[in-house]
Structure formats: C-alpha cells, structure tokens
Amino acid sequence: MTSTQSRTLSMLVDGEWAPAASGATAETVSPATGEVIGAVPQGDRSDAQRAIAAANRAFEGWSRMTAFERAAKMHAVGDVIERRRDDLARTLTLDQGKPLASEAYDEVDELVEYWRMAAEDAKRLGGELPNSFSPNKRVLLVRRARGVVGVITPWNWPYTMPAELLAPALACGNTVVWTPAPTTSVCAVALAECMAEADLPPGVVNLVTGPGAEVGDEIARNPGTRAVAFIGSTPTGRMVASAAAGKAVVIEMGGNGPVVVMDDADIDKAVEATVAACFLCAGQSCTAGERLLVH
C-alpha cells in the first residue's frame, strides 16, 4: 500500500485469500491521517476453526521436510520482504503510525533478519547426548515438530513481533494459525502476502483477522493447536494462559522497566538515552522505561 487509498482486505486460509465466513468487515483508520485505509475481515470462531484444520492438514508435509529445505523456503520469504521494503515501510506508517524514516524502515530491516536468523538456526539445532550404558546400544536423538502453533501478536511492532514467533515455529517444522491485533491488520496482511508470494505450501501459515475475544480465544482453546505463543498486554496474556491451559504456552507481556542513572554517568548522554528508552515507538514498547532511578 503506497497511499491512503482504502482497499478491502482478505484473510489467508489454506493458501487462499478469502473474506470472513460471515462477510463482516470493519474499517481501519490511519493514526497518521485519520483516513480509512482498509476494510478488514472480521473473522469469528468458525474462521479460526477452518484455519486450524488447514494447518493440521499441512503439518505432516511441512514437518517432514529437512531443516535445510525449510530454511530455503524461509530465505525466500526474506527475499520477498527485501524486494517489498519500501511498500512495507509505508504500510507500517499508514497502519500503525511509526515515522517512516526513523522507525518504519528499521522495523522492516529487522523483520528480514528475524526470518534469516530462524532459517539458519534451525539447521544447527544441537544438544548433548549421553554415552550409552551398553557397547551394543547407540543413543539417538530424534527431533519432531510439536504441531500447529497458535500465534497472537500486538500492534506496537506489527512486523517484528509476529516474526519473532512465526519464524522459529515454521523453521522447526510447525505450522501456524496467526491472529494479529485488530488495529494493525493491514500490516499483518502485507506480511502474509510476502509469505504467500514466497510460495510457502498452503496451510503452513494461516492469517485470521478479527476480534481477539472470538478468534484469539478459539485459537488458544481449540484442541487442534498444540502450542500457543502470545505477545501483548498483561491482562490479555493472563486470559490466553488460562484458555490454553494444558498446552505449551510462550507468553511475553508488558514490562515495568526502570532507567537507572548511576552517580558517575555522563548526564547529557544519560538524558539522551533516557528519552530514547522511554519514548521510542511513542513509549508503546514492552521494554520502555517507566521509572527513572537516579543514584
């Protein structure tokens, strides 16, 4: 998206772009201009269930690939992101509001690195094996992917936070059902378009937009998801952890980080660093400084 021209968006389920089953949409507005920039599908539980079923069907083929085969697919996604760098950065500014030059391009560049890092790390998964207790026996380690991973992501870093969860899960052979924050669904669709353009197999990544109370809750509770990964607020994280009880759960919630200034600090540099720590991304970051402790 290179202008404020509004468009009707779609969800990605089983390799196909489609509206919500109900046909419902909601307007999303640019915080930079106040203009409507898209009509976002309002998925519900049935859409999430359809996506989970697609991810389960895709799991066997994806997980049976070697790490090197999956890495090649992951690098292909990185290639598409690099080609679409300008478009992705502009979309981020329109949808989320980050300044184009100082923050949006940086986030897109980080996005590429997340994909490439996960691709390479998956080739090198290591670990120690104990010696066999018998000369006639050999100890082997067989790694198996967990299954379908539900991914729920926030609005403040709408490219890098999804990549932080999506890329490692995919590189290790899992398939994914992803629902983004409703306020930055345009960015989510743009990232999903990159994955589709890179020819990830149908059903390996599924994007379902809509209210978290329905879509996110279904992803967390549905027995078809074997793990749930969440980044977001503490109250929502607690609800996700409760809904996903009994599954593997990875949760990153809001922090309460102080900025500590020691008595031997360079005050000018400390002030500059404190402003950056507290107000990067308008202060909407889990690592943002919330208190100032001066020695």
Residue ranges and their predicted role:
Residues A167, R226-I231:
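Periplasmic-binding protein-like
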Residues G34, R70, L92, G173, ...:
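Residue-level signal for inorganic ion chemistry
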